């Protein structure tokens, strides 16, 4: 029988077991629902991996048990056959997986192409240590089939790295970057997503101030319209104080919508808005932000939602705040981009699609209170009321056009139940009903509304501080 044959030929039995082990190892990276456990760390160019691996492992240790497999480069570079690596390291890797939460498998500089390929093949995710002096083509082709995180060493990498690898995230090679990467790997990376709302969006800065002062660590930011401005400011690495100071200077201090013109494409020229985003963000690229960021706009041509994750920060924010009829749209190739609030004023679903952690949502949808009131004008009216009656031809006091446009966004945007989305940790709802949607001078009231709402959320959910 076949069993007798195996017993009589031990070499055949051993060869079959090795072949089966190899087949199992090579099929291992199939997608599963569990958190990634084997993390490949691959050095590109002359970047030394060892000190960074130590920093990543130390950061991961605060979330669980971590093992490191980093054989000497003299050993791995001398290997001539891929099967030799499979046979030599399969048992070591399996044993490390069984006894740890994460295993870092390291391909340092000079480790050899076969070992780099083995690391890429066996990993659930890859961390690539980027040396800008070397092209991304040097990274193993299997890297394009895995979620990739970039650690940027020395100079910031150019966009060709994003073209090649489409990384999930990128981090600077410092303690903050290693901590953020570890939280992503552990599934504890907190995201903050913020709604649009005109001047009411200034409440986001108060929310962020209260959260960060309480010790909440946020790695990812996203939003629409005024939420995009706040998201980009925080992703830029500004602390709450600096972000609020910038908001006072570039938003509250300049009245960005006060450059009205003959309404051919919009009621305003958009020049003040351009200066706002340029003053805030300059020529920074999204790829070079130290924290995760996206903004949302809408393409007037196709009707599609556009999620901005690459390119100019100023361009992404400018598109997201281009209220149709009020601010001129942004022409981008074959796209004509306007305020994302038309389709998704609070893009929580976009943020929640990232499986690396929970999400805090800041929702500004409240009962609409027009800044100038509404209803029948009294029989005896003040000169401004008389002028309004003459211009509108009605005895009804109606909201200004700008407020009507912004409120229409609230009504048209998705009304998805935030509590039904996966990974929503908290919903913060500042009471901004008394703040005019275009009254940017009410920044102090908006900030306080944000702080109060965040304070209430922290009291209800103290576990947000982690």
Give the residues covered by each predicted segment.
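Non-catalytic peripheral regions of patatin-like phospholipases
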Residues: 146-167, 175-177, 190, 194, ...
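Conserved catalytic-core segment of NTP-binding enzymes
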Residues: 92-93, 103-174, 365
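Phosphate-binding P-loop
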Residues: 29-36, 185-186
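Helix-rich "cap/lid" substructures immediately adjacent to catalytic or cofactor-binding pockets
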Residues: 177-221, 260
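Catalytic nucleophile loop
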Residues: 195, 217-236
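P-loop/Walker-type NTP enzyme "switch/lid" segment
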Residues: 43-45, 65-122, 287, 296, ...
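Cyclic-nucleotide recognition modules
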Residues: 1-17
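Glycine-rich phosphate-binding P-loop
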Residues: 35-62
């Amino acid at each position: 029988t076949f069993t007798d044959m195996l017993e009589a030929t031990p070499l055949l039995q051993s060869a079959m077991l090795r072949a089966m082990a190899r087949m199992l190892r090579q099929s291992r990276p199939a997608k599963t629902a569990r958190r990634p456990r084997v993390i490949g760390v691959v050095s590109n160019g002359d970047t030394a991996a060892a000190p960074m691996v130590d920093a990543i492992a130390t950061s991961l240790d605060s979330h669980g048990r971590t093992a490191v497999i980093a054989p000497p480069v003299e050993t791995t570079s001398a290997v001539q056959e891929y099967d030799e690596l499979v046979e030599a390291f399969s048992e070591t890797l399996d044993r490390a997986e069984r006894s740890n939460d994460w295993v870092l498998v390291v391909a340092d500089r000079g480790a050899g192409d076969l070992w780099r390929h083995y690391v890429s093949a066996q990993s659930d995710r890859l961390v690539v240590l980027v040396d800008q002096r070397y092209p991304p083509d040097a990274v193993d082709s299997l890297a394009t089939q895995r979620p990739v995180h970039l650690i940027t060493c020395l100079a910031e990498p150019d966009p060709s790295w994003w073209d090649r690898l489409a990384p999930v995230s990128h981090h600077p090679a410092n303690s903050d970057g290693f901590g953020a990467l570890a939280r992503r790997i552990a599934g504890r990376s907190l995201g903050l997503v913020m709604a649009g709302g005109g001047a009411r969006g200034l409440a986001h800065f108060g929310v962020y101030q209260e959260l960060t002062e309480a010790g909440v660590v946020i790695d990812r930011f996203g939003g629409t319209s005024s939420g995009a401005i706040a998201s980009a400011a925080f992703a830029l690495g500004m602390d709450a104080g600096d972000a609020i100071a910038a908001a006072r200077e570039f938003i509250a201090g300049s009245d960005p919508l006060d450059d009205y013109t003959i309404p051919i494409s919009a009621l305003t020229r958009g020049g003040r808005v351009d200066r706002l985003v340029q003053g805030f963000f300059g020529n920074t690229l999204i790829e070079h932000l130290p924290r995760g960021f996206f903004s949302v706009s809408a393409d007037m041509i196709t009707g599609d939602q556009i999620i901005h994750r690459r390119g100019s920060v100023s361009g992404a924010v400018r598109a997201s705040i281009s209220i149709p009829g009020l601010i001129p749209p942004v022409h981008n190739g074959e796209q004509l981009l306007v305020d994302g609030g038309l389709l998704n004023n609070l893009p929580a679903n976009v943020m929640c699609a990232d499986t690396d952690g929970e999400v805090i949502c800041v929702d500004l949808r409240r009962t609409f209170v027009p800044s100038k009131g509404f209803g029948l004008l009294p029989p005896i009216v003040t000169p401004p009321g008389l002028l309004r009656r003459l211009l509108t031809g009605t005895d009804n006091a109606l909201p200004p056009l700008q407020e009507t446009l912004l409120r229409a966004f609230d009504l048209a945007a998705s009304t998805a139940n935030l509590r039904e989305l996966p990974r929503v940790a908290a919903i913060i709802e500042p009471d901004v009903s008394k703040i005019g949607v275009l009254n940017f001078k009410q920044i102090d009231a908006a900030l306080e509304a944000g702080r109060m709402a965040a304070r209430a959320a922290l009291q209800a959910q103290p576990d947000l501080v982690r």
